[in-house]
UniProtKB/Swiss-Prot annotation:
The lineage of its organism: Bacteria, Bacillati, Actinomycetota, Actinomycetes, Mycobacteriales. One of its GO terms (cellular component) is cytoplasm. Pathway: Protein biosynthesis; polypeptide chain elongation. InterPro entries: Elong-fact-P_C, NA-bd_OB-fold, Rib_uL2_dom2, Transl_elong_fac_P/YeiP, Transl_elong_KOW-like, Transl_elong_P/YeiP_cen, Transl_elong_P/YeiP_CS, Transl_elongation_fac_P. This is Elongation factor P. Involved in peptide bond synthesis. Stimulates efficient translation and peptide-bond synthesis on native or reconstituted 70S ribosomes in vitro. Probably functions indirectly by altering the affinity of the ribosome for aminoacyl-tRNA, thus increasing their reactivity as acceptors for peptidyl transferase. GO terms for biological process: peptide biosynthetic process. Its main location: cytoplasm. CDD domains: S1_EF-P_repeat_1, S1_EF-P_repeat_2. GO terms for molecular function: translation elongation factor activity.
């Protein structure tokens, strides 16, 4: 059990026999009336996000989620295979469980897998990854670091929007949460 004071992003709650992860929360203390906590909860099974408001101090049942450090090994055609770093057990994970971040996976990349009662719930990739540009159109004379963008295909096959000065062969830092370009890595 936890109170609303214990809320933090990533905490998994058990509400209405469903596991819901806190994506966002905000403590609100209005000038008149009692304080409350506004949250955005993501159903860990369906991925649906809902808004829910709790009165401050309310006790809520939390789910005991086991986070394990694992290493992504390979894609066997249908599933993504990861290995537990402690006992070297290999576990296949479905594409639905991997989510959109799967397009940035490289072999031997560290990931965190969250389990509830020995069932994998969700996978967390590193916040940013460094990937090489496999193909992008050449930049034009006069391209500057500010301005437009163009598509670039990365070594994993993912396509992202990058600034015009990026060339094939550059190594880029990419945010795995939204697929956005962060910076060019000096080689």
């Amino acid at each position: 059990m936890a109170t609303t004071a214990d809320f933090k992003n990533g905490l998994v709650l058990k509400l209405d026999n469903k596991l819901q992860q806190i994506v966002e929360f905000q403590h609100v203390k209005p000038g008149k009336g009692p304080a409350f906590v506004r949250t955005k909860l993501k159903d860990v099974v369906s991925g649906k996000v809902v808004d829910k408001t709790f009165n401050a101090g309310v006790k809520v049942e939390t789910a005991t989620v086991d986070r394990r450090d694992m290493t992504y090994l390979y894609n066997d055609g249908t599933d993504y295979v990861v290995m537990d770093d402690k006992n070297y057990e290999q576990i296949p994970l479905s594409p639905e469980l991997m989510g959109d971040g799967a397009r940035f996976l490289l072999e031997n990349m560290p990931v965190q897998v969250s389990f509830y009662e020995d069932q994998p719930l969700f996978v967390e990739l590193p916040v940013s990854v460094e990937l090489k540009v496999k193909h992008t159109d050449p930049g034009l004379q006069g391209d500057r670091s500010t301005g437009g963008t163009k598509p670039a295909t990365l070594e994993t096959g993912a396509e992202v929007q990058v600034p015009l000065f990026i060339e094939t062969g550059n190594v880029l830092k990419i945010d795995t949460r939204d697929g956005s370009y962060l910076s060019r890595v000096n080689n």
